[in-house]
């Protein structure tokens, strides 16, 4: 690929994640985007367990059974001359670690909000990570087909709770059973809800921004209310500011209904136009790697075992940051200095795959992994070793002791634990004295998924013994004395052999600090 071709290819890319609180409609809008991208012909409903239809992005059996996303899926398609990479993230709060890591691999985020509920806790958490990264955030106020809160109230709440300017790009004309359409502020037209002519769902507006000609909607109170609201936000609202959007200080707000596929196409067309192409990535050496740099580089943000249960494979997901990835490329793994040839690579449509021959900045490539990679690894072709910024790691809050139910199946038990831990699906610790396995998780559902996958993917039933909620704190190995351990502060080591204590409660932690003031206790995120 010539430098000009590389630049053109990079400028076509739009790589983003969809974030939301559970049940705000994230998976439904993902499906509708795939529908417009020609990837699927019919949108499934993630809740439709009885109908046997499942969301394309929910490919793991447990996701289909429970109607939730527990892993990040990657989907790619072309639309309006752009190459779209969607990273669908787990909506369930117990899987925030996977979601946070995914947000490190995107150039923008789409925040889906239930217009009946407004800003919810998980939305707030994920928004903070996007804000911290300074990436553009686009808002889709969903479920307009149901009665919800007033649009002005929703925007006011968003601005107050998330500390970001909101800029409405369209405006609802009614909602629920009174939903008539969307006033497209940017394009000066009205998109009708359930129009008589589906091929042309738009109403033209006159120079004053009102419906041209005769139309019964003119006399409808929801239309006049919408005009009043639009006049108000025109005078007192925030002006559209691309510079503020680029830095994550302003969010364009679109209203619609993913379930009825209303307003989604308008959103997609605006998004591909407004969202950024891949930009420079910061390294730990505090240098910037430009996407058009001729040397290939990328980082691994996710590892997934058993995407194809028939082959028991393991895929490392790489975000390409610069240069061109080609099949058979020779790269260096920065962490070990090891050189390797990447012959087996793939691109995704959830669990469906195709061999990838070429990829550029913004693309997500799957590498078949035999155990070489870890989450956070950097690979590159340049002479100078580089390491991209570290991915966030979290302090677990819940812990369980885990053992194999059948002692004759120790091999599959150990393999399953090793692979699921390397995925980042759960955290693993060993006790110093007995080498018992202790699992750490952010939420209870992680344990359930771990237990399910051990049984169904590794044929290893496990016994999970709760040791309760504990406070995990790491210490300097040089300060460690095993006599510090007790039943109230369990001494364990992580997968990097770093020592830490699992304190029974805050009181136990304070008691320890008073007794050993010279020992510094640290937490992850």
Swiss-Prot record:
GO terms under cellular component: cytosol
Q: Does the keyword Transcription apply?
A: no
GO biological process terms held by the UniProt record: regulation of translational termination
> What keywords does the record list, in alphabetical order?
Cytoplasm, GTP-binding, Nucleotide-binding, Protein biosynthesis
The source's superkingdom equals: Bacteria
Q: Where does GTP bind?
A: 20-27, 88-92, 142-145
Q: Does the keyword GTP-binding apply?
A: yes
Subcellular location, record wording: Cytoplasm
Pfam families in the record, alphabetically?
A: EF-G_D2 (PF22042), GTP_EFTU (PF00009), RF3_C (PF16658)
Cystines in this chain = none
Entries under CDD domains matching the protein = RF3, RF3_III
- All copies of domain tr-type G, residue ranges: 11-279
Question: What is this protein for, i.e. what is its function?
Answer: Increases the formation of ribosomal termination complexes and stimulates activities of RF-1 and RF-2. It binds guanine nucleotides and has strong preference for UGA stop codons. It may interact directly with the ribosome. The stimulation of RF-1 and RF-2 is significantly reduced by GTP and GDP, but not by GMP.
Family per similarity comment: Belongs to the TRAFAC class translation factor GTPase superfamily. Classic translation factor GTPase family. PrfC subfamily.
Recorded protein name is Peptide chain release factor 3
Task: List the gene name.
Answer: prfC
């Amino acid at each position: 690929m010539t430098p000009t071709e590389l630049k053109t290819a990079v400028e076509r890319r739009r790589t983003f994640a969809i974030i939301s609180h559970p049940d705000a409609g994230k998976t439904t809008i993902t499906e509708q985007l795939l529908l417009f991208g020609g990837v699927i012909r019919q949108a499934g409903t993630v809740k439709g367990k009885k109908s046997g239809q499942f969301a394309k992005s929910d490919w793991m059996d447990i996701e289909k059974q429970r109607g939730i996303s527990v892993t990040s899926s990657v989907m790619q398609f072309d639309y309006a001359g752009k190459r779209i990479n969607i990273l669908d993230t787990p909506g369930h709060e117990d899987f925030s670690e996977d979601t946070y890591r995914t947000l490190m691999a995107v150039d923008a985020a789409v925040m889906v909000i239930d217009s009946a509920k407004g800003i919810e806790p998980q939305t707030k958490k994920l928004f903070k990570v996007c804000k911290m990264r300074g990436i553009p955030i686009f808002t889709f106020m969903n479920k307009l087909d149901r009665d919800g809160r007033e649009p002005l109230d929703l925007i006011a709440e968003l601005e107050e709770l998330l500390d970001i300017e909101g800029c409405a790009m369209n405006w609802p004309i009614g909602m629920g059973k009174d939903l008539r359409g969307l006033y497209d502020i940017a394009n000066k037209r009205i998109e009708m809800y359930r129009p008589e002519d589906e091929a042309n769902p738009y109403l033209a507006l006159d120079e004053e921004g009102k419906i041209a000609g005769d139309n019964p909607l003119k006399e409808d109170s929801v239309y006049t209310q919408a005009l009043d609201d639009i006049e108000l936000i025109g005078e007192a609202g925030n002006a559209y500011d691309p510079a503020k959007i680029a830095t994550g200080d302003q969010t364009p707000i679109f209203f619609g209904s993913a379930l009825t596929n209303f307003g989604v196409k308008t959103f997609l067309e605006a998004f591909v136009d407004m969202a950024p192409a891949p930009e420079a990535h910061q390294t730990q050496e505090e240098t910037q790697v430009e996407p058009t740099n001729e040397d290939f580089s990328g980082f691994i943000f996710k590892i997934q075992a058993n995407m194809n249960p028939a082959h028991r494979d393991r895929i490392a997901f790489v975000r390409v940051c610069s240069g061109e990835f080609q099949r058979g490329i020779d790269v260096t793994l920065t962490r070990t200095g090891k050189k390797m040839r990447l012959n087996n690579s793939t691109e995704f449509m959830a669990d469906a795959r195709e061999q990838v021959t070429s990829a550029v900045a913004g693309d997500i490539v799957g590498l078949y992994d035999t155990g070489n990679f870890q989450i956070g690894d950097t690979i590159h072709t340049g002479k100078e070793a580089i390491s991209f910024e570290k991915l966030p790691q979290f302090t677990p809050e819940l812990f369980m002791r885990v053992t194999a139910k059948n002692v004759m199946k120790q091999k599959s038990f150990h393999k399953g634990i090793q692979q699921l831990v390397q995925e980042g699906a759960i955290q693993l610790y060993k006790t110093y004295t007995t080498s018992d396995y202790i699992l750490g998780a952010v939420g209870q559902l992680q344990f359930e998924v771990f237990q399910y996958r051990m049984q169904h993917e590794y044929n290893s039933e496990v016994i999970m013994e709760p040791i309760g909620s504990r406070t995990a704190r790491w210490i300097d190995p040089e300060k460690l004395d095993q006599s510090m351990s007790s039943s109230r502060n369990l001494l364990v080591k992580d997968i990097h052999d770093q020592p830490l204590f699992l304190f029974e409660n805050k009181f136990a932690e304070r008691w320890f600090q008073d007794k050993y003031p010279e020992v510094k206790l640290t937490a992850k995120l």
